[in-house]
Design a protein with these regions (language model features):
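PLP-dependent aspartate aminotransferase-fold enzymes
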Residues: 90-106, 110-207, 493-516
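A glycine-rich phosphate-binding loop feature that marks nucleotide/adenosyl-phosphate handling sites
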Residues: 85-91, 146-150, 173, 200-201, ...
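Conserved PLP-enzyme active-site core in the AAT-like
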Residues: 150-309, 370-371, 380, 384-387, ...
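Charged, compositionally biased N-terminal leader segments and the immediate start
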Residues: 1-19
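Long, charged amphipathic helices and adjacent flexible linkers at domain junctions
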Residues: 201, 308, 436-455
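Active-site C-terminal subdomain of aminotransferase-like
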Residues: 269-370, 374-377
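N-terminal entrance/gating region of PLP-dependent enzymes' catalytic architecture
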Residues: 19, 42-127, 321, 444-516
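Conserved C-terminal alpha-helix-loop-beta "cap" of PLP-dependent enzymes
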Residues: 351-429, 437-439, 473-475, 481, ...
Length: 516
């Protein structure tokens, strides 16, 4: 008996492409072509086409495609991540995962050029900016950048534009390796002289445009950046601090310490590891630098009736207006992940985030007190330990289900995250040959100024409240869950639900980027 094709398979193309054969023919007739192949032949030069035929593989249905993805996911061994290096274990609250990350009302909305159809996202992004501003102690924050390394690179560009006479930039040797690499390359690309230095030594010479300081360092160590900030200011330069937003719940803000710019990643505010991205970076600056800052900036205005309304501000910085003289490109953003991070802060509030930070720090302190060879006295969540053979320790812990960082042949880094437990500390201590002991706080520069004081961070802490808030915001937006958007194409609008559903599977979402 001849069977009809699987309905799921036969309809996959039609479900996700849109036009059917008759609609396609209407468009071809209007353009004067007999077929889609004829249109492509006319539009695409022959010399740039792929030679030969594509592999002849059978099409998969949605169900079959997900089953195939499941086989790929099952091949990943997900170790519990204690690796660090700018990527931290975090817990995404289910209400945020389901109603932001996996919700087409949020992930198919277009770049918010038009405030009339973007009020929900603009409010959520303003929450992100408020969060970053309060944590960093600097008055102006943007609505996200692409990642921590490129944010540091953007900070170098900002310092160079603001201090045109300075042609030297100093990079802290304690920056994460990937941040150091990207930042140095960006500096060289704009003809700056790059010096990678141990900032515990005194700065030598003049002609600086700025310095980039790690706070904390890649080994977790926390040092007071004020002497370096003061020294660069005395030489007419600017100070950028690369920091950790969760650490800033417990250590003093860069702005309070005198920094001009602060950058970092908001990943550990509820955004999964995702094997390295996408994650929303942030930048905050002093008021004097706001017109040089890259990235979207959400501001509060009034509508035609005089009511408060949100819109993108200072757009004369943007490439679509200023062209080659622009200091920003509006597409250099991670809006969905910034919304996720902001909602994580709203959901937990200052008290909840402080508890999370204190617990993580406490576990790190207990671990540090239980092993020999700890390299630094002050730290937040990461402990660097000197050992005889770092790779042997890493392998032993991998066999036990843990991923830790071989900083060098004789140093292992252990970075605690939100899901870490006392039982994890016990197993880690055992692998290092230590014995359990209680630690004491070792922050180095404890925070004395309040943070997250805006009422939005103290009003929405139950799942019902958050669910309703997210719905209220998405109802103020226009996305593909309501209608077609007659604008550009740089969104995830073509991603089928069956594809988006898989990105939060633990076997994909919880893999650290430096996992073997």
């Amino acid at each position: 008996m001849t069977l009809p094709p699987i309905t799921d398979s036969a309809s996959y193309l039609a479900r996700h492409t849109g036009p059917d054969a008759s609609e396609e023919q209407v468009m071809l007739d209007a353009l004067g072509y007999e077929s889609l192949d004829a249109l492509v032949d006319a539009a695409l030069p022959a010399d740039i086409r792929l030679a030969g035929d594509l592999p002849d593989r059978p099409a998969l249905s949605e169900t079959q495609a997900q089953a195939r993805l499941r086989t790929y996911a099952d091949r990943n061994t997900v170790l519990k991540a204690f690796y660090g290096q700018g990527f931290s274990d975090t817990i995404t609250p289910p209400v945020i995962r389901r109603n932001v990350v996996e919700d087409p009302g949020w992930y198919t909305a277009y770049t918010p050029y038009q405030p009339e159809i973007s009020q929900g996202r603009l409010e959520a992004l303003l929450n992100f900016q408020t969060m970053v501003s309060e944590l960093t102690g600097l008055p102006i924050a943007n609505a996200s950048l692409l990642d921590e390394a490129s944010a540091a690179a953007e900070a170098i560009g900002l310092m160079s534009r603001s201090k045109k006479k300075g042609r030297r930039v100093v990079l802290d040797a304690r920056l994460h390796p990937q941040v150091l690499s990207v930042a140095a390359e960006r500096a060289r690309a704009i003809d700056l002289e790059v010096a990678v230095e141990d900032l515990s030594a005194e700065l030598v010479g003049e002609d600086y445009c700025g310095v980039v300081i790690a706070y904390p360092g890649t080994e977790g160590d926390i040092t007071d950046p004020r002497p370096v900030i003061d020294a660069i200011h005395e030489r007419g330069g600017l100070a950028t601090v690369v920091t950790d937003p969760l650490a800033l719940m417990l250590i003093e803000s860069p702005g309070e310490l005198g920094a001009d710019i602060a950058v970092g990643s908001s990943q550990r505010f509820g955004v999964p590891l995702f094997y390295g991205g996408p994650h929303a970076a942030f930048m905050a600056v002093s008021d004097a630098l706001k017109r040089q800052m890259p990235g979207r900036l959400v501001g509060v205005s009034v509508d035609a009736e005089g009511a408060p309304a949100y819109r993108l501000a200072l757009q004369t910085r943007e490439q679509h207006i200023r062209r080659e003289r622009a200091t920003s490109n509006i597409c250099t953003a991670q809006a969905l992940l910034a919304v996720t991070a902001s909602m994580y802060a709203v959901y937990h509030g200052p008290e909840g985030l402080t508890r999370i930070a204190e617990r993580i720090h406490g576990l790190a302190c207990d671990f540090a007190a239980s092993v020999e060879g700890v390299r630094h006295d002050a730290f937040f969540d990461t402990v660097a330990v000197e050992v005889a053979d770092a790779h042997a320790v890493v392998d032993t812990l991998a066999d036990a289900g843990y991923l830790v960082r071989p900083v060098s042949d004789t140093v292992v880094g252990v970075s605690f995250g939100e899901s870490a437990t006392e039982a994890d500390v016990e197993k880690l201590v055992e692998a290092f040959g230590g014995s359990l002991a209680a630690g004491t706080s070792a922050l180095g520069v404890p925070r004395e100024t309040p943070t997250l004081t805006h009422e939005i961070f103290s009003s929405i802490h139950s799942e019902t409240q958050m669910l309703r808030y997210l719905r209220q915001l998405s109802d103020k937006d226009l996305a593909l869950d309501r209608t077609m958007i007659p604008l550009g194409s740089c969104t995830m609008k073509l991603n089928p639900t069956a594809g988006m559903e898989t990105i939060t599977w633990p076997e994909f979402a919880n893999v650290h980027p430096f996992a073997p």
